[in-house]
Amino acid sequence: MPDQISVSEFVAETHEDYKAPTASSFTTRTAQCRNTVAAIEEALDVDRMVLYKMKKSVKAINSSGLAHVENEEQYTQALEKFGGNCVCRDDPDLGSAFLKFSVFTKELTALFKNLIQNMNNIISFPLDSLLKGDLKGVKGDLKKPFDKAWKDYETKITKIEKEKKEHAKLHGMIRTEISGAEIAEEMEKERRFFQLQMCEYLLKVNEIKIKKGVDLLQNLIKYFHAQCNFFQDGLKAVESLKPSIETLSTDLHTIKQAQDEERRQLIQLRDILKSALQVEQKEDSQIRQSTAYSLHQPQGNKEHGTERNGSLYKKSDGIRKVWQKRKCSVKNGFLTISHGTANRPPAKLNLLTCQVKTNPEEKKCFDLISHDRTYHFQAEDEQECQIWMSVLQNSKEEALNNAFKGDDNTGENNIVQELTKEIISEVQRMTGNDVCCDCGAPDPTWLSTNLGILTCIECSGIHRELGVHYSRMQSLTLDVLGTSELLLAKNIGNAGFNEIMECCLPAEDSVKPNPGSDMNARKDYITAKYIERRYARKKHADNAAKLHSLCEAVKTRDIFGLLQAYADGVDLTEKIPLANGHEPDETALHLAVRSVDRTSLHIVDFLVQNSGNLDKQTGKGSTALHYCCLTDNAECLKLLLRGKASIEIANESGETPLDIAKRLKHEHCEELLTQALSGRFNSHVHVEYEWRLLHEDLDESDDDMDEKLQPSPNRREDRPISFYQLGSNQLQSNAVSLARDAANLAKEKQRAFMPSILQNETYGALLSGSPPPAQPAAPSTTSAPPLPPRNVGKVQTASSANTLWKTNSVSVDGGSRQRSSSDPPAVHPPLPPLRVTSTNPLTPTPPPPVAKTPSVMEALSQPSKPAPPGISQIRPPPLPPQPPSRLPQKKPAPGADKSTPLTNKGQPRGPVDLSATEALGPLSNAMVLQPPAPMPRKSQATKLKPKRVKALYNCVADNPDELTFSEGDVIIVDGEEDQEWWIGHIDGDPGRKGAFPVSFVHFIAD
């Protein structure tokens, strides 16, 4: 930093120079004077900028403060007017309170206005005068006189030094320096002028320092006192109002109690009136249901029909408002309006979003109000106008009725509707679903799709108030539901839900409402049950245990375990502790999508509907939608799109779900995503799912009923694989019958679907990104067939069973003769054996297993194709042998000591090959075939040689009473549980015993 001179040093040096110019050393300090002026100028420039910003801020505060004062005054006026209105309406207590607050606000406003004015006067004005006065101008203006004096001084001293050096040179001398004393007298005038300008500059700087320092702080002190006065006066106003406020609080409590009592009386009166009108409302609803939908506007004359072509005059939207003749046509619920020029496409209006109104001023004019504008039309005469209006209204009514009732002539859509009705009927028959989940009212018809429970109409209104993030309500009778909205209802139900969510409900003083409770009681209870979860059973306290239970519930596909985790308050979108995750940081939704199959789709649905965020990404940026597209999982994709999952998110590779679907050529996923992008995705979507419906046969013989009433020893659950498939309605004319036959495939108390039956190979093959192999590797030569149902209970007519079998069968070779126990196993899976009764009902059996491919879910999502006439020529992928039951007709099975006689088995059905007339003969004449007399069962004490069988496949037990064995194990048959399941133990290891499927073994020839 250059040397500078202080003010005191400058004064001392100047005085010394003034007294003794020849002895002074001031000439050596002139450079320091100039450095000092430059430094002061830099500091002043910085201060000038800061003070300018300060002034700007103060002005902004003043402007906003005045605007605030103006708004406060308007608020005060409104309070004063409102209080006056209350006083005039015989409510003096409330009116006086409003007036007091008006006066209080007015006082505070006046104090604040005074404070703003003080700030403007005390701070803003001095700053403005300083910046426009002493600090006015740009950098360097203040030191211009000093710079001129310095320049003159330097010029004169340079000139004198030059003359002195030339004079010495003339006399033969050389001078390098000239002392100050030599030129002191000659430079006195210039030196005095330089000292004067320096002194003037320092005086101005001193004045500026006072104004921007001491004076500004003095002003801030004044403003501080003004602020103190503002707060003190405001506190006085508050203290003066405090007693009135305390009295007012007591009065308001009394007034509110009176108003609450009045409200309670009104609610009771309303409930009484509602109950009195319930009968009339039911009658009205029945009448409305029996007739077509009635539009909430005048009906058109039905004689004019729903279609019309012609010309109308349309008033233009321009400034001139001229009538323009346009060609118009009404068809299929749309009004088409042609333009004046042929090259422009006509405007097409959906009448479902329009309303037709008459024009009271012009009899031959009418208006059509759409969602974005109003069209003014004029006909040739009044009669023509009435015809056009009738056609428009009729076409709209027809389109609306078609939308409500659907197209009954489309086979596939009709099948889905029939399936939906069957599912709804079974949901209503579930335990606890005959009454409301919350109040116990009978026959609830409102479904919470995200919780799977049924409520009455009163409780459903409270559910709607909670919001869709707690409960999504749909009507079973009024709304058109898709099967995807019934997944949770089919798997949870009121009884299972309340077992968890009402586990801690106090029994002695029950707060649960009854059907006659008012809406307040219902709201308090429902809020406590669903939002606070006050009565739910809480199993886990810490978050780690909650996440572990959530992970286990998803892994084991336990919907009630998932509901328990939900009741514990776990965050369903949090990352789960999964050691073998496909990608790091997976959520429960990622895991559910990754391990889903036809039986666990409801697990995904619960997570989709009750998670706050469907767009959580893994460590590699994948969302659940990415997983769906990687695995071609269209069913989960439907659920996620219905839940509004984002389709624009890209993973770490920059791929969106649609990009993945296109790259892997997953056409179904690509189509769904394209529909969602264009806004054409239907949220009421149908999903492929193993519904396991219970179907009650209408035509049952007396023998069937007797058989159902007999106690069945060692009854086991069934394990059917019954997929409801579309596209097979060509095999029979009645599509409804096909849907009913599909529902027949399921039995009572069905066994849970086991992963060993149908493994989800999709993720193992595709998540790695490598192409799947042509055939999945297996440890044995062939894969095991699906396990047969255990102890089938429901029966089916021969005709429907025959039709159903033809729909889902695969061609087989070989004859259909009855084999003895020593025959070798069949090469191809046989047809299910017939169970013959007095009326020849057929035991329903599951369809043949779907052949495993590298993408099982993709194969299952495809609808089944109708069997062509030459079905025997179509070969499915190789399936493992599934030999028929080895029970010889003339030998009882070992251990067949039963309390009832053994029903004789009919001959097994032959292949579907039309040439096998012997096999199809008994089936085609099923209604004529008489069953043989049943043979009496022999007691277990009968000495028979033990029957030995050999395992064809590996089998892992699903239940404790079942046998686990490996391929090649020899099993000793101890008894027969039913036609498809026997009892036995491993040869040489009697401790390993249990039930085993007959189709997994073959006899060893003795």
Swiss-Prot record:
<feature type="compositionally biased region" description="Polar residues">
    <location>
        <begin position="794"/>
        <end position="823"/>
    </location>
</feature>
<dbReference type="InterPro" id="IPR002110">
    <property type="entry name" value="Ankyrin_rpt"/>
</dbReference>
<dbReference type="InterPro" id="IPR043593">
    <property type="entry name" value="ASAP"/>
</dbReference>
<feature type="modified residue" description="Phosphoserine">
    <location>
        <position position="822"/>
    </location>
</feature>
<dbReference type="Pfam" id="PF16746">
    <property type="entry name" value="BAR_3"/>
</dbReference>
<dbReference type="InterPro" id="IPR001849">
    <property type="entry name" value="PH_domain"/>
</dbReference>
<comment type="function">
    <text>Activates the small GTPases ARF1, ARF5 and ARF6. Regulates the formation of post-Golgi vesicles and modulates constitutive secretion. Modulates phagocytosis mediated by Fc gamma receptor and ARF6. Modulates PXN recruitment to focal contacts and cell migration.</text>
</comment>
<dbReference type="InterPro" id="IPR027267">
    <property type="entry name" value="AH/BAR_dom_sf"/>
</dbReference>
<comment type="subunit">
    <text>Binds PXN, ARF1, ARF5, ARF6, PTK2B and SRC.</text>
</comment>
<feature type="domain" description="Arf-GAP">
    <location>
        <begin position="421"/>
        <end position="543"/>
    </location>
</feature>
<feature type="coiled-coil region">
    <location>
        <begin position="256"/>
        <end position="283"/>
    </location>
</feature>
<feature type="repeat" description="ANK 1">
    <location>
        <begin position="584"/>
        <end position="616"/>
    </location>
</feature>
<dbReference type="Pfam" id="PF01412">
    <property type="entry name" value="ArfGap"/>
</dbReference>
<keyword id="KW-0040">ANK repeat</keyword>
<feature type="compositionally biased region" description="Polar residues">
    <location>
        <begin position="288"/>
        <end position="300"/>
    </location>
</feature>
<dbReference type="Pfam" id="PF14604">
    <property type="entry name" value="SH3_9"/>
</dbReference>
<feature type="repeat" description="ANK 2">
    <location>
        <begin position="620"/>
        <end position="649"/>
    </location>
</feature>
<dbReference type="InterPro" id="IPR037844">
    <property type="entry name" value="PH_ASAP"/>
</dbReference>
<dbReference type="GO" id="GO:0005829">
    <property type="term" value="C:cytosol"/>
</dbReference>
<keyword id="KW-1003">Cell membrane</keyword>
<keyword id="KW-0597">Phosphoprotein</keyword>
<dbReference type="GO" id="GO:0005886">
    <property type="term" value="C:plasma membrane"/>
</dbReference>
<feature type="region of interest" description="Disordered">
    <location>
        <begin position="288"/>
        <end position="312"/>
    </location>
</feature>
<dbReference type="InterPro" id="IPR036770">
    <property type="entry name" value="Ankyrin_rpt-contain_sf"/>
</dbReference>
<dbReference type="GO" id="GO:0046872">
    <property type="term" value="F:metal ion binding"/>
</dbReference>
<feature type="region of interest" description="Disordered">
    <location>
        <begin position="701"/>
        <end position="720"/>
    </location>
</feature>
<keyword id="KW-0677">Repeat</keyword>
<dbReference type="InterPro" id="IPR011993">
    <property type="entry name" value="PH-like_dom_sf"/>
</dbReference>
<dbReference type="Pfam" id="PF00169">
    <property type="entry name" value="PH"/>
</dbReference>
<keyword id="KW-0862">Zinc</keyword>
<keyword id="KW-0333">Golgi apparatus</keyword>
<feature type="coiled-coil region">
    <location>
        <begin position="729"/>
        <end position="752"/>
    </location>
</feature>
<feature type="domain" description="PH">
    <location>
        <begin position="305"/>
        <end position="397"/>
    </location>
</feature>
<keyword id="KW-0472">Membrane</keyword>
<dbReference type="GO" id="GO:0032580">
    <property type="term" value="C:Golgi cisterna membrane"/>
</dbReference>
<keyword id="KW-0963">Cytoplasm</keyword>
<feature type="modified residue" description="Phosphoserine">
    <location>
        <position position="701"/>
    </location>
</feature>
<keyword id="KW-0343">GTPase activation</keyword>
<dbReference type="InterPro" id="IPR038508">
    <property type="entry name" value="ArfGAP_dom_sf"/>
</dbReference>
<dbReference type="GO" id="GO:0005096">
    <property type="term" value="F:GTPase activator activity"/>
</dbReference>
<feature type="domain" description="SH3">
    <location>
        <begin position="944"/>
        <end position="1006"/>
    </location>
</feature>
<feature type="region of interest" description="Disordered">
    <location>
        <begin position="764"/>
        <end position="916"/>
    </location>
</feature>
